[in-house]
Amino acid sequence: MKRIITVLFATGLLAALATGCKEEYKTYSDAEYVLFADTLATYAVLQDQDYFSVPVSSTVACDYDRTFGVEIIDKGSNAIEGLHYALRSNTITIKAGQRAANVEVRGLYDNIEPTDSLGFILKLVMPEQVNWNLYHDRTKVVMMKSCPYDVNDFTGWCVVTSLFLNQYPGIENTSLQRLIRTEKHPTEENMIILHDWLFSGYDVTIRLDPGDPIEPLVTMDKNQVLADEASVFGQILGDNKILVTNSPLYDSYFNSCQHFVALWICLLYTSPSPRDTR
């Protein structure tokens, strides 16, 4: 069963507290250092994928090949080598005249569950003089399974869960969930029509973007009519329309493995303030 999840977000404004810090800068002149490009990164494991690359950088290019070892650190890792992943090689070589190389990792797709978040730590084995203390010789690789995308997986009967319905059920809703029907838009690519989404008689559309397996985003066209004010609030506050669009604060996303969509939305109506919801 497909699922669409929307959760009521607090109406109050959230304040972010910023703390000051001192930054310590280190300069160098033609010094050679080798390091992972990121200390933590997430990678998609795809069904038809050969290897994904964990980048390693050097501060300078040399006129000779440089080879370094790659060690797997068990502490802090929950992925198992040989079960969840395998390295192409336990060494990397930065070619003469170049400043980068990759540790190539094969994610073992069939052994990773859709809900798994598996990580392991890699360490560069290299001479001390090329290890820059400002950065680290280690990186954590996090793997997420990304199933093949098919827009039809998000069509058909669908259970909608929304905390908005707990606060504003209107005259028809009696729980946080609704059973609705979804279908592929007849002309717009990757667009889904949600029939009677939160209130009967009001359809909305969403668009799925499968371009980045790590960030499978969902967008909505602006100013779609979610419901009429009288049915939801019991009174007409203005033009009797409640509009819905993307939340400017949070990204909406979908999951091809578990066939669900999580929508962060913003409601607009004649009221002292709009409400952010998910």
Question: Can you name each region flagged by the protein language model?
Answer:
Residues Y269-R278:
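Single conserved hydrophobic/aromatic residue that forms the stacking wall/gate
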Residues K22-T161:
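Acidic/polar, low-complexity intrinsically disordered N-terminal segments immediately downstream
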Residues N166-V218:
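N-terminal glycine/threonine-rich, aromatic-flanked beta-hairpin/loop signature
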Residues M1-L8:
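Bacterial N-terminal signal peptides that target proteins for export
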Residues H195-C257:
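Contiguous, well-ordered beta-strand patches that form the walls/edges
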Residues F9-L14:
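Hydrophobic helical h-region of N-terminal Sec-dependent signal peptides
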Residues L17-G20:
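C-terminal motif of bacterial Sec signal peptides marking the signal peptidase cleavage site
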Residues E189-W197, Q258-L268:
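Short, hydrophobic/proline-enriched secondary-structure or compact coil segments at domain edges
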